[in-house]
Curated annotation (Swiss-Prot):
Induction data: By maltose, less efficiently by trehalose, and even less efficiently by sucrose.
pH dependence of activity: Optimum pH is 6.5. Only 13% of activity is retained at pH 7.5.
The protein's Enzyme Commission number: 2.4.1.245
Gene: treT
Temperature dependence: Optimum temperature is 90 degrees Celsius. 65% of activity remains at 100 degrees Celsius.
Subunit structure: Homodimer.
UniProt keyword annotations, A-Z: Carbohydrate metabolism, Glucose metabolism, Glycosyltransferase, Magnesium, Transferase
Protein's name in the database: Trehalose synthase
Primary enzyme class: transferase
Enzymatic reactions: an NDP-alpha-D-glucose + D-glucose = alpha,alpha-trehalose + a ribonucleoside 5'-diphosphate + H(+)
Function: Synthesizes trehalose from ADP-glucose and glucose. Has a much lower activity toward UDP-glucose and GDP-glucose. The reaction is reversible, the equilibrium strongly favors trehalose synthesis.
Cofactor: Mg(2+)
Amino acid sequence: MYEVTKFGGEGKRLEDYREIIGDEALEAIKAKAENLKDKSFVHVNSTSFGGGVAEILHNLVPLMRDVGIDARWFVIEGTNEFFNVTKSFHNALQGNKELRLTEEMKKLYLEINKKNAEDIDLTQFDYVLIHDPQPAPLIEFYEKRQPWIWRCHIDLSDPNLEFWKFLRQFVEKYDRYIFHMEEYVQEDLNQEKVVIMPPSIDPLSEKNMELSESEILKTLERFDVDPERPIITQVARFDPWKGVFDVIDVYRKVKEKIPEVQLLLVGVMAHDDPEGWIYFEKTLRKIGEDYDIKVLTNLTGVHAREVNAFQRASDVILQMSIREGFGLTVTEAMWKEKPVVGRAVGGIKLQIVDGKTGFLVKDVNDAIEKTLYLLEHKDVAQEMGKNAKERIKENFIITKHLERYLDLLNSF
């Protein structure tokens, strides 16, 4: 286990958000933090780069420190075999019923967690927060002396029960369980320990801050994207759950009506996702020689600022995930006043108000129809984008997230 000491949001101050959230909201957060001054708090997850959890922590940890909490962040380490096992957990918990949990998988999963527990004494902190299934068994290997919280960032609405029953024996030892939405809460857990808390974006991070028109245009030019032609974009990891093939199918049908349309597939290759590389290659094969589809990743120099530029340059954002714990890429696009066409699953349903801040769709044909409509009705797209930003501002930005954490810690 190692500690993350460099943060994307280094030097973040609550005061920086006054203009965005207003005086009253800011002072309320300060008041809630008063009781927690000098308390120590530790986050533990499985990667410091790639995916929504790491991105949130890069900004949330510095903000927690700014309000007086001694917040730290540790990342568990493991072999490729371990991360293959945890990827199976992820897929099974999100609904893959064909996967089987073997004794070897259980053994490796517990061994690596035990090894990580030997690296650092988590009982030295006043509060411990464990993110997702990868490090969930850590609680087994300590004599718990303080509140332990487990946070689930994935869509648990229809899990493979073999995996869930095995995981549950660790989860139920925690003092609180955080889920993004009610529909992810498992009935066999103690309901009194359940906390519903959606994640958030940071409006001042490089991914979401305002960019000049000239920077956006330069970024498009650097990656050979034509700003004069319509742009459809999906930002997502290369993962079967993200519906990337469906996005390509939507684009191809839209292109029959609007031949000049371009598609940007923007994604991060994350360190804890060995399966992602296989799916990435499959995606390239499906695309073939269509040069109006750009595959843009951290491997080709795409980082937070570039993603920001691509989202701001897009006419329509797609999110065709088959399962989606929350969908922070939807949140990001809505913050940038973009209409999102998203499959009506998981956290996407929580964010998009159908017909007002974007469109919720059930399948590829529905997505084709709504994407064409938005490309052909710019005024509607613009109005939806404005509504979308308001919705995010009220519900899903990092200061609201921080406040919800303060409420939780104050409840112990």
